[in-house]
Amino acid sequence: MELKEYLDYLVEFIKETVKKANAKGVVIGISGGIDSAVVACLAKKAFPNDYTAVWMPIESSDEDYKCKQELIDQCGIKAIDVELKETFLSFKKAIKDSTTPEHKLAIANAKARLRMTTLYTVAQTNSYLVLGTDNLDEWHIGYFTKFGDGGVDMVPLVHLLKREVREAARILGVPTSIINRAPTASLWEDQTDESELGITYDQIDAYLAGEINDENVKSRVDHLHKISEHKRNGAVAPKEFKRK
């Protein structure tokens, strides 16, 4: 199947999933990154009059803002702003005041969880479903926040490699500034995905596509997949209670 044909299928997949849930449309959080840009374009195609993109800045960079604005202007994306910085700072202070030791990644992941809460509030208000943005690479290695950006109703890009997401962005007319930008979750200043992961998306793509046999890459990807298994599964339950 050609990628363009698959993108058409994804539009129908989104429509059908919403219909089955007896919902009216979809909501998507946009970040200035390529994955959310692609999903926003698919959302617009699926529900031209019943979708909302939400920009939720929390110490977001100037580059984040510039890229999300280019997406809105160039692709005609309908978006609202929900400023979460003060909410995040209040939360951060409350955790600190509780004498809980500060953990850099845990605090950073709280940003994703605040955004998830925001998206579900917008979704429930409008009878929408929440669209996720994880691609195959991110899903396989668990590069998403549990009950944060991983807390969604559907994941349209979950079978697409990162390079296929880039190609999808070109097909859908996403701004080149977003396509060429270094992938970042914007967890903290100057953070990039690849520097945090210790591996490149090109390497992950190649491994998942069966194109390379590099033991270092295989070991790293397999390790990340194993330790993130809990993110892809539901809550762990004990054995069933047998009533007499």
Swiss-Prot record:
Entry EC no(s): 6.3.1.5
The reaction(s) this protein catalyses: deamido-NAD(+) + NH4(+) + ATP = AMP + diphosphate + NAD(+) + H(+)
InterPro entries: NAD/GMP_synthase, NAD_synthase, NH(3)-dep_NAD(+)_synth, Rossmann-like_a/b/a_fold
Keyword Magnesium carried by entry: yes
Known pathway: Cofactor biosynthesis; NAD(+) biosynthesis; NAD(+) from deamido-NAD(+) (ammonia route): step 1/1
An example Gene Ontology CC term for this record: cytoplasm
Keywords linked to the UniProt accession: ATP-binding, Ligase, Magnesium, Metal-binding, NAD, Nucleotide-binding
Protein residues bound to Mg(2+): 35, 138
Keyword Nucleotide-binding: yes
CDD domains: NAD_synthase
Binding of ATP, residues: 29-36, 133, 162, 184
Record NCBIfam families: nadE (TIGR00552)
Protein family according to the UniProt entry: Belongs to the NAD synthetase family.
Protein name: NH(3)-dependent NAD(+) synthetase
Gene that encodes the chain: nadE
